[in-house]
C-alpha cells in the first residue's frame, strides 16, 4: 500500500489564502490609482511638444523647452505664483495654529459632554464637500446675501465680498480653515491626552501654573505631531485649493486669487493651449516634489523626526 501524501501546504500559501479577500478589495482602488494617476503621466510629453489633439502625441512636433520659456513670459505668471504662495502659506499656518489652540482649550474642559459636542461641531464641516460649502459661502457673502443683509441693518453699506480683491482671499483662507480645522484638532487633542499626567503633576508641585505646564510640557511633547503635519503640508504649498476657488471666483478677483491650478485650467480647457498648460502643471509637480524632500530633510535634521 502506498503511503498517502500528507504534505502540509506551505505557510506562504496559507497566508495568501487568508489574505486573498483583502487583496481583492484593493483592486478597485489600485485600478482607480493607475487610470487616473499613473496613466496620465504619459501626457507629460506634451510639455515638450506643440501638441494638438488632431495630430496626437506621435505627430506633434517637438519644441524642447519652448513651452517653459513661454510660461515664464506670461504676463500674469509671477502674479499667479505670488497668489498661490500667499494663500497656501496662510492656510498652512492657520490650519496648524487654530486647531492647536482649540485642542488646548478643549483639553481644559471639565464637562465631557460639552467637549464631545464641541468636537462634533468643529469636525462636522470636514465631511462636507466644497460643492456644498461653496453654496453656503455664496449665500452668505454674495451682494444680497445674509452677511450684507446684517450689515445693512446696522447701517453699513453692502460689500462685494466675492468681487473684491481684498476680501475674496480672506474668505478663501478663513473658509478653508473653518472646513478643515476639525481634522487637525482631533489629531492634536489625541496627542495632548497622551501626555503623561505625572509630568504635569510634578510641575504643579514645583509651582508651575497651567500656562507654564502647557508651554514647557504639553507643546514640547506634541512637537513631533506638529512637525509631521507641517511636513505633510509643505508638499502642497503650490496647491492653494483649486476646487474651492473655482466654485467662488470670477474675473473680478483674478488679480488676487488666480492660482497655478486655475491658470492650468484656463490655459488647457478654455484656451486650448495644451502644451503650455502641461508645462505649467509639470513645473508645479517638480517644485512640489523638491519641497517635500527639503521639508523632510529639515525635519529629520533639526527635529529628529523621520518617516522612512
Q: What residue spans do the PLM features occupy?
A:
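Short, Lys/Arg-rich, polar N-terminal cytosolic tail immediately upstream
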Residues: 1-16
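A structural signal for multi-pass alpha-helical bundles of membrane permease subunits
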Residues: 18-308
